[in-house]
């Protein structure tokens, strides 16, 4: 994960910049950004996007704080048309907020489509061999 804001902002254009299970925040800042909204699968990424758009500063610690176990179900949940529609809606919101350009919106939608519509075993390989490097 990127540590500094200068790295977090460009990373957030295409991927969730924080590991939610390790996030600490000021409650009032979250409320000022609109709190968590109903945004299936992507509630945290939606909130971080709105907070970034409002100028809140983020920082990721370099230490690994949690080792999370995954199962095949994780890769199955992250696929399908409904998941893609939510990602497309998030990209639209990010574009409206000024976090991403039209080109980044299109690129993000294409990448999300590829990830969500591939078979689960390929999605697992992509996460393990490409996205977790």
Enumerate the predicted regions with their spans.
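Short alpha-helix boundary/capping motifs
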Residues: 58-59, 79-80, 96, 115, ...
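Terminal low-complexity segments of carbohydrate-biosynthetic enzymes
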Residues: 112-133
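Conserved nucleotide-sugar donor-binding catalytic segment
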Residues: 2-81
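Conserved short hydrophobic patches within well-ordered secondary structure
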Residues: 36, 68, 87, 110-111
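Short, hydrophobic secondary-structure boundary micro-motifs
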Residues: 60, 103-104, 125
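Catalytic core of nucleotide-sugar-dependent glycosyltransferases
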Residues: 68, 76-100
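Anionic, Ser/Thr-rich low-complexity intrinsically disordered regions
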Residues: 23, 101-117
